[in-house]
Amino acid sequence: VPRRRIGFAYRFAAVICKPPLVVLLKRDWRGMENIPAEGGFITAVNHNSHIDPFAYAHFQYNTGRVPRFLAKSGLFNKGFVGAMMRGTGQIPVYRESTDALSAFRAAIDAVERGECVAFYPEGTLTRDPDGWPMTGKTGAARVALQTRCPVVPVAQWGANEVLPPYAGRPRLFPRKTHRVLAGPPVDLDRFYGREMTPELLKEATEVIMAAITRHLEEIRGEKAPAVPYDPQRERVEQRRKTRVQAQTRRKGYGGRSVRGPAEHGPSERRQSAHGVPADGAQAGPQYQEGRHQERQNEQRRAGKRAAAREEGLNT
């Protein structure tokens, strides 16, 4: 692809970014032949480090087809960074506003102009504990079905070893290897010409994410979980646990019955710190013995007090 199509701003950004990337990361790049030489297309890439957009852009820059990333709109207002984002043709994503659909329209326009739009279908850094791709959002599938452009699934691994997701400090040494595998375009033919329902978009997205995950398995030499991490499912589960804990505390404060954890089974009961059954169940032998000992101690103390009073009266 002629350099004039890359543009001055992208070439200037490459001059700044490539030297530190070359120093930090060795390269194991495969599948460049699957990047289309002409025409608009989408790359769908997994996201596991704050620096992997730069590492991945380095890979695709070397193919001659530079990516246009969808990025948070706030980055476009940050001085030099914002100027570079605008100059290199990145696409702002406005969230929770009337402009939320503008990124979708801009992505379609870019593809129809013959450019590459790079999607991180997960929408954010993976939260999977082992770094596997999460469930994806439907933006890439929506643009692909609207334009019928090729979708190239890309897996990457290595930038996360320099700067793990949600980590505070980078791990610069020893030098890590950035591994990239770009696969052949995903076959989405069976989705064309059908009504673009949420169910259809979800199914197409699952096909794209499955292709990314297969390539990452090949890179890592490991098997991914059978069910991908689902942030929405985890949020629902966390809210459920929070509600249960809040209800348990309220019942405990009000003197009402408190059931133990469900996994203990209906026949088992949780006891308080003093050994009192929390749900009104029949007291066990340990609790009864403790109460008996307490009554005996109280009787001894009462006897001593009475003896002391009698001694005082007789003095």
Language model: regions and residue ranges:
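Long, low-complexity, intrinsically disordered segments
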Residues: 268-315
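Short gly/ser/thr-rich secondary-structure transition/capping motifs
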Residues: 22-29, 100-101, 162-164
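A cross-family acyltransferase "interaction/gating" segment
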Residues: 130-199, 203, 226-257
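Catalytic core of membrane glycerolipid acyltransferases/transacylases, capturing the structured
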Residues: 22, 36-97
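Hydrophobic/aromatic ligand-binding patch that stacks against planar heteroaromatic rings
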Residues: 59, 84, 109, 142-146
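Catalytic-site beta-strand/loop segments enriched in glycine and acidic/polar residues
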Residues: 108-140
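Short hydrophobic helices that act as membrane-entry/anchoring signals
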Residues: 6-25, 82, 86
